Every structure is written in structure tokens, then in C-alpha cells.
Swiss-Prot record:
GO terms for biological process: regulation of DNA-templated transcription. It comes from Equine herpesvirus 1 (strain Ab4p). The lineage of its organism: Viruses, Duplodnaviria, Heunggongvirae, Peploviricota, Herviviricetes. This is Tegument protein UL47 homolog. Tegument protein that can bind to various RNA transcripts. Plays a role in the attenuation of selective viral and cellular mRNA degradation by modulating the activity of host shutoff RNase UL41/VHS. Also plays a role in the primary envelopment of virions in the perinuclear space, probably by interacting with two nuclear egress proteins UL31 and UL34. Residues 114-134, 146-155, 185-207 have a biased composition (Acidic residues). Keywords: Host cytoplasm, Host nucleus, Late protein, Transcription, Transcription regulation, Virion, Virion tegument.
């Protein structure tokens, strides 16, 4: 044979491509030698998981070694004519076609299962398969049926500390296969495998999985041992896995709010101390002039101009009106019988800690007659209240629970949060998983303390609520004065210049100071951070979870009780949709969803400021010797709350400015998440306005017990609203910093949120961005749910879709503005602005790499991605 051609025998020399078997049968079962040349390669959009293509890593490695060894005739496996003749006349056995390595980021996690509903309902209809297609789909799908048909049905209890099954190591095996690819021989076929691996790496770059070094907080040396135990799960027996996970759950519980290892700072942070010292000096005083101390016989007389400016009454949410009409068993404070002597014996009739030494018990409960809230709530009453919550109609049509004791059915395994093809649709599998995750994040911590320890009564929550609400009012007193002096010193330089967020807000703030004569009990010079006890740590945590406690809602009595339930349910729905649309493997949202999230964050933050000013004035009125003076006109008049949301012209104009934006109007109607967020916002707006109306009606010669109950109900709603804003902000900031998405936000939203979070510190422990995503992944792991990119696989593609946009939303938008400008600021890049709030929003423990992707994107105007996914 010609020496120039050697073993090739004169055949043309060319670089061989991947075999036709691999290209046309990427998912064919191992060992199938039948050739099929007409079947095209399917993309990831067809929902193939590649499970049958994966084999044991050791077996694959051995096969690769055998295929890379030269044959006995020293002839290469060529696809040319000469190569075909050589194989016919040689003694070599043809090598079996090898399936390509499965993509590690697309294969479903081990143990993935479907819920019973997913097994009953099929996904999108599939075209009939011919004989060739059936061969290609061998062992991958059953023709005309779901691949999840034989999965076992699991009904996990959400609060289980000892899981019955452990995670499989299939995902880790994929990682070993990837690592092993670099050790293969440098043959031509191996070069093709490396090219395919590079393509897979480019695909994986499209989704940024959060792997920041600050993702787990260092606690003690024991924490490292727990992490090592986690890493050893894949190589352990089933019993060892269960013991390891139980040990970690027990360890983490010690550092949960209220646990023995949970640390609470006893004094305000250095940032808060510096904020108050730099903004107000000991010699600073506010002198107010006017007739504010005169008796006001007709509070509405000052608001007649509103009637001419706003011609239409405020629209209330139709679902709220339906809820009120269906509330057939109201319970009012005047109907409650309680024994004062018994309450004194139980040491319940005592002054809250915030006013110890300032007011005795008799004087305090005369000003705030709230002893009826300590009356016993029976188990039957609590059950009926929880049942009323569950029976409320949700947007997605599934039952929502307000307590851990009720079962939540969901599918373990992969969680897929990609957008659906249907408008206003969402994957039902992800929705059910999000319902379980929301309960674990926002309810389980409180319900564990209440039910498992069986040591906490709703009395403790009532005491915490009134104490925290009074401390919050005192923080409003301080913040309002800091803003006044920030405006006065806005042109100062050096050490005398106030903090920049205070200067930015000082000209547009709604926190207005009260006259010193009516706010003596609220006066303070530093921010109050609230009680520091185990119970208070639990009540302050979990994004404002007290509203989920049925006994506490009932204790406040109507009208506060029904409004708290209404708000809690619809905000829970909003958070379920937020969790069902993003996770750490896919932290981004669609453009329309981001527009809606920013609009709700801006409006709800302004609404929180309006409500806190109302709390400030109402608290001063309840504690005042004379509650009919003009200084309290803001909460005594009824006309403002009949014409404007929460009785605020500023909020009215802000809603018109934001909701009339064409982009916001499109976003509101196009996605399910946007629908849930807007209905949640309008639910809070309606309930708070209704409570303020009831307060103004009862304050004029009505029941003082009802006035106190409404005041506490507003506080309970505000705790839940502030927690929801914390939740929403962390999701939006994660999309900007971890997902690298371009998000424009009003420039005054983050300064306003940061200040209000400091004001509400006695009521709510805010969670930083890093803590939020870390805790979220840990809880998903506890639920045996694995975040996965891309759409769900075949059989799990059931979509829950809203048929039409809600008719309620357009009617809730104001028809015109009253004044020019709502004080929201200009639009700025969120990723850049967040860098000024690393301590308050991102988290003190965050490294400098947090937000790097968002900043790179912000600098060039597009997402910093190395490659694009193949379609």
C-alpha cells in the first residue's frame, strides 16, 4: 500500500465528524444499532430529559477507553468507501454506537416525581409516532402517554423534620462525568466530544446560578462539619442520609428566630446611631404655629376642596365587597365577655414594655381599651377562621393554607420556572411547589413555635403587636424630625451635612411632625429597634407572619379581623406567583413581569409611608388627653378616605402616574404574575382604606374598643405589607444582580424603603438579599425540590392559565391627577443604585462579587452572556 497513505489505503484524508448515529439519534437507548438517517435532531424545547442516554459513569469511561484503543488491524473506523471495505474484510467487531453525554443542566434530578394531578392530566397533545420515531424514543416515553405514569404518589407533610427518603446522587454523577471528559485521549472523536462539551458550557452560561462565597453564613466550627456531612450525602446509605439531614435541621433550628443560638443586638446599629446624630442635634427643636390645639367640631370642613378636585369616589376592590357580603358571622368587641380579675391574675393587664414607668396599667388601658383581645379563642373558632381562609377563591384555583398543620401536595424533584407559551399561564408543577415553599418561608417558623412547643398563646402576640406598633409610632416621630432638619441643612457640607437618602426624601416625604404638645409620649432621640426576647424574635421574623395566626386575627375582632384575613390571603397569592417564576438556577423574569414588579414596589412603598403617618397621628390621638383637636384632623375626617386611597392625594396622583403608563398597562394584563401582584396591591389599598374609614367613624362618639381594634388591625396589615415589600424587593434585586437583567426603578423608591424599614424595625426583621436567596435554596433542599433551568419535561407540562385579564384592575386606576408630580423620582438603573445599600438591602455579609453581573450589564447596556442557547 502507498506509504504516503499508510493504513488509509489511498482514501481521502479528512477530519471525521460525529457519527450519524449520534447526530440523528441523540436520545436512542444504549445498544440500539439500527440506523435511521431521516430523523432530525430534536432541540431542548421538545422537553426531552435525556435520562435514557445517561449510563453509569464507570461503564461509560470503560467504553470510551475501549473505543479509543486501536483495532487488531490497526485500521481506523472510517465512514468512507475504503473504510467500509476494510471493515467487511477484517475481523474487527463493529463498535457499538455511543450515546452522547447528557447535559448536566438539563437532565431531571434524581427522584423527580409528578403529583397525582399531573399523572391524571396529560400535557400538550403529541403527534402520532411512526416506527422510526418510536425507536428514537425508546425507553424515553410511552407513546401517547406521560413518562410520569408510574411515579409513586407522595403526600409530604410540610413540617416534617425527618424526611423518609433522601436525595439521589444522579446530579453529582453528572458532575463526575463532566470532570472525566478532560481525561480522555486526544483522538479525533474525543475532539468532537470536547467541542460538544464546550457547546454545553455556553448553554449553561445563559443561566447564572448563585454560587457566591457569601451564600452560606459562617457561624461556628460546627457549621463546617454540617457542610461536610451535606457533601457526603451522595456516598452514604439511606439511613446515613436521613440522620445527616435530621442533624442539619436540628442544628439550623438552633439559629432560627427564637432558637438558643439566635443572636439579637440589644442596641441600634452604628449606622442608625450615626443617622440620628448627624441629622438632629440636642439643641434642635421644632416650633409650630397655628390653631392646631383648638377643638375641631367638624373635621370634614377642611376637605371640601377635595370634593371639587376629585369628582368620583374611590373604587374599592370588588373581591373585598364580595368578602364583606359573605362574612355572615361577624364578631365585634362589644360582644365579648371577659373577666378582668382573671386577666389580672394571669398578669396580662399590664402596661406594654415601651411605656413602663410612663403610664400605669389603669391609665394605659383607659386610653387603649384592648383587654377584650386577651379573651379565650376556642379551637372551633380558630378552625372556622382557618377554613374561611382556605375557602377564599384564589387566582390559580387551588386551595391556599394559612397554617402548617394543613397538607400541601407538591411534586418532589425538579422545579421548572420558565415562561409558558400561553398568555397569563404558569406551570402547575412549579405553582404547587411554590405554595409549599411559601408556607415554609413565611408560616412554618411561627407555626412551629405555636403548635410544636405548645407554649405560646395569642396573648403574647397581642402584647408584642401593641408594643411594636407604639415603638414604630415613636420612630415615626423621630424620622419626621430628621427629615425636617435634613431639608434645612441640605446645603451644608462636611460633617454637618445629613445623610443623602434623608436629603433626597426631605422635600417629598409624607412623614410630617406633630406638635410637641400632643406627642410627648412619643418623643425620642434615637431609633427604637424593639423588644429583644425569644418570642419577639419569632413574631418579628418570616416576612410578617403574624397575620397567618387565626387566633390573633380573631382576637382583634371585626372589622379588623376580616380585613386582615383578606390582605393576608391575597399577598400570599402574590408571593406564590413570585416563587413559581424564578429560583437560583433561573433568577430572571420576563420584561413585562419586571415592569409590573417595579410599579408595585414603588406604589406599595409610598402606600406604606402614608400608612405609617396615619399610625403616627392615630397613636398620638389615642394617647392624648383631648382627642378632638385639629391636630388629629388627618385621622378624624371621613371625606379623605372616601375620595383618595388611604386618604392621600399624593398616593392618588402616584397611582395615576404609574398605572397610566402604557408599559405598565400592558404588563398588568399580559402575565399571571402581574395580575397577582396588582390584585395583591389593590387588596391592601382597599383594606387599609376601609379600616381608616371605620376608625374615623368610630372615633366620633363610637366604640373606643372598636377604634383600638382597628388601630391594631392596621398595624398587623402593615407588618405583612412591609414583609411583602421585603420579599418583592429581594426577588427584583436578585433579577438585577444575579440575573443581570436591565431594571429601571424610580430613584426615590430605595431611599424611601430603606428609611421605612428602619422605622418599622420593632415590628419586622428585614431579610437581606444574600440571606433571602441562601435560605430559599436551603428550604428547597429540605422539601427535596431542585431548581432546574428550562421548561419541565414531558408529562409535567400542565399549565394553569387565567382565561382573561381581571376586569377589576382598570377601574381601580384614578382618572386624573390632582397635583403635578407625585414625588417618585426619575428612572435609574437598579443594579447601580443598589450598590449604595449594601448594608441595608444586599447584606453586610455579601462579598464584592454580589451584583457583579448586573454592573457589567449596566456598563454596556446588554446582558453579559458569552453564548446563546441553541434553538
Amino acid at each position: 500500500m502507498d506509504q504516503h497513505h499508510g493504513a488509509r489505503g489511498g482514501a481521502p484524508i479528512r477530519r471525521p465528524r460525529r457519527s450519524i448515529e449520534s447526530r440523528s439519534h441523540p436520545f436512542r437507548a444504549t445498544g440500539n444499532t439500527q440506523r435511521t438517517y431521516s430523523t432530525p435532531r430534536l432541540s431542548y424545547r421538545d422537553g426531552l430529559s435525556g435520562r435514557t442516554a445517561s449510563r453509569d459513569p464507570q461503564e461509560q469511561a470503560s467504553n470510551q477507553d475501549e473505543s479509543s484503543n486501536p483495532s487488531t488491524s490497526n485500521a481506523q473506523q472510517s465512514t468512507s468507501f475504503w473504510g467500509y471495505l476494510r471493515r467487511v474484510f477484517s475481523d474487527d467487531v463493529p463498535a457499538q454506537p455511543q450515546a452522547p453525554r447528557p447535559r448536566a443542566d438539563f437532565a431531571p434530578p434524581a427522584g423527580e416525581e409528578s403529583s397525582s394531578e399531573e399523572e391524571e392530566e396529560e400535557g400538550p397533545a403529541q403527534a402520532p409516532l411512526d416506527e422510526e420515531d418510536q425507536l428514537m424514543y425508546a425507553d424515553q416515553y410511552s407513546v401517547g402517554d406521560s413518562s410520569d405514569e408510574n411515579d409513586e404518589e407522595e403526600d409530604p407533610r410540610l413540617g416534617s423534620d425527618y424526611p423518609t427518603s433522601a436525595e439521589s446522587s444522579e446530579y453529582h454523577d453528572h458532575g463526575e462525568m463532566v470532570a472525566g471528559a478532560g481525561a480522555e485521549s486526544e483522538s479525533e472523536t474525543d475532539i468532537d466530544a470536547e467541542e460538544e462539551e464546550e457547546d454545553d458550557e455556553d448553554d449553561e452560561d445563559d443561566m447564572e446560578v448563585i454560587r457566591d462565597e457569601s451564600y452560606r453564613l459562617p457561624r461556628t466550627w460546627l457549621d463546617k462539619s454540617i457542610r461536610l456531612m451535606d457533601e457526603a450525602l451522595a456516598q452514604s446509605s439511606e439511613l446515613s442520609k436521613a440522620i445527616t439531614k435530621s442533624t442539619r435541621s436540628l442544628y439550623d433550628s438552633q439559629f432560627a428566630p427564637g432558637g438558643r443560638g439566635y443572636t439579637q443586638t440589644a442596641t441600634p446599629s452604628r449606622r442608625l446611631v450615626q443617622l440620628s446624630r448627624a441629622g438632629m442635634y440636642d439643641s434642635d427643636k421644632i416650633v409650630m404655629t397655628g390653631d392646631y390645639m383648638e377643638v375641631d367640631d367638624d373635621p370634614d370642613s377642611a376637605y371640601q376642596s377635595w370634593v371639587r378636585a376629585i369628582r368620583h369616589p374611590l373604587a374599592m376592590n370588588p373581591s373585598w365587597e364580595e368578602t364583606i357580603s359573605n362574612h355572615t358571622n361577624p364578631s365585634f368587641s362589644t360582644d365579648i365577655d371577659y373577666d378582668i380579675d382573671e386577666l389580672i391574675e394571669k398578669n396580662l393587664a399590664r402596661t406594654p414594655p415601651v411605656f413602663e414607668g410612663l403610664l400605669d396599667s389603669a391609665e394605659f388601658f383607659y386610653k387603649l381599651p384592648m383587654l377584650y383581645t386577651y379573651a379565650t379563642i376556642t379551637q372551633d373558632e380558630a378552625y372556622e377562621e382557618r377554613l374561611a381562609w382556605s375557602n377564599t377563591q384564589a387566582l390559580h384555583g387551588h386551595e391556599q393554607s394559612s397554617w402548617q398543620a394543613l397538607l400541601v401536595y407538591y411534586s418532589r424533584g425538579g422545579m421548572y420556572v420558565s415562561p409558558t407559551q400561553e398568555p397569563r399561564g404558569i406551570w402547575r408543577r412549579a405553582l404547587k411547589q411554590a405554595m409549599a415553599l411559601q408556607l415554609k418561608m413565611c408560616v412554618l417558623g411561627l407555626s412551629d413555635v405555636v403548635t410544636k412547643q405548645n407554649a405560646t398563646h395569642h396573648h403574647a402576640a397581642v402584647t408584642f403587636l401593641v408594643d411594636a406598633l407604639l415603638r414604630t409610632a415613636r420612630n415615626c416621630y423621630l424620622a419626621s424630625r430628621l427629615l425636617v432638619f435634613a431639608w434645612e441643612r441640605r446645603r451644608e457640607t462636611g460633617a454637618k451635612r445629613p445623610a443623602e437618602p434623608l436629603i433626597a426624601l426631605s422635600g417629598v416625604t409624607l412623614l410630617q411632625p406633630l406638635p410637641p404638645e400632643v406627642s410627648e409620649l412619643l418623643e425620642q432621640r434615637t431609633f427604637d429597634i424593639g423588644l429583644r426576647t425569644p418570642n419577639s424574635a419569632v413574631f418579628r421574623a418570616f416576612f410578617g407572619s403574624l397575620v397567618y395566626w387565626a387566633e390573633l386575627r380573631l382576637a382583634l375582632r371585626d372589622p379588623a379581623s376580616i380585613n386582615c384575613r383578606y390582605v393576608g390571603f391575597h399577598l400570599q397569592t402574590s408571593e406564590i406567583y413570585l416563587l413559581a417564576r424564578a429560583h437560583s438556577a433561573s433568577p430572571g423574569y420576563t420584561k413585562e413581569e419586571l415592569v409590573a414588579m417595579e410599579a408595585i414596589l414603588t406604589l406599595a412603598t409610598l402606600m406604606l409611608e402614608v400608612a405609617l403617618q396615619w399610625v403616627h397621628v392615630a397613636c398620638a390621638q389615642l394617647l392624648s388627653e383631648n382627642d378632638t383637636i385639629k391636630a388629629f384632623r388627618r385621622v378624624s375626617a371621613s371625606i379623605p378616605h372616601a375620595l383618595a386611597p388611604l386618604g392621600s392625594i399624593r398616593l392618588h396622583d402616584a397611582e395615576f402616574e404609574v398605572l397610566s403608563n402604557p408599559d405598565v398597562m400592558v404588563a398588568r394584563d399580559e402575565t399571571a404574575l402581574s395580575q397577582a401582584l396588582f390584585l395583591g396591591y389593590f387588596s391592601v389599598r382597599t383594606a387599609l382604606t376601609a379600616c381608616m374609614r371605620d376608625y374615623s367613624h368610630e372615633a366620633d362618639g363610637g366604640s373606643k374598643e372598636t377604634v383600638t381594634g382597628v388601630f391594631l388591625g392596621v398595624g398587623l396589615i402593615l407588618q405583612r405589607l412591609a414583609g411583602h415589600l421585603n420579599f418583592l424587593l429581594n426577588c427584583l434585586a436578585g433579577a438585577a444582580l444575579y440575573g443581570g437583567q436591565k431594571i429601571n426603578i424610580h430613584s426615590l423608591t430605595l431611599p424611601r424603603y430603606s428609611l421605612l424599614a428602619d422605622v418599622m424595625a420593632p415590628m419586622l426583621q428585614r431579610q437581606s438579599l444574600v440571606d433571602f436567596w441562601r435560605a430559599r435554596d436551603n428550604m428547597l433542599e429540605d422539601l427535596e425540590i431542585t431548581p432546574r433551568p428550562g421548561p419541565p419535561t414531558q408529562g409535567k407540562r400542565v399549565v394553569v392559565e387565567m382565561p382573561l385579564p381581571s376586569d377589576d384592575l382598570p377601574d381601580m386606576t384614578p382618572g386624573a391627577s390632582v397635583n403635578n408630580g407625585a414625588g417618585l423620582g426619575r428612572m435609574v438603573d437598579m443594579a447601580k443604585q443598589l450598590q449604595h445599600y449594601r448594608e441595608t438591602i444586599i447584606g453586610e455579609e455579601a462579598t464584592s462579587s454580589v451584583g457583579k453581573r448586573g454592573l457589567i450589564r449596566a456598563g454596556v447596556g446588554v446582558a453579559a452572556l458569552r453564548g446563546r442557547r441553541r434553538k
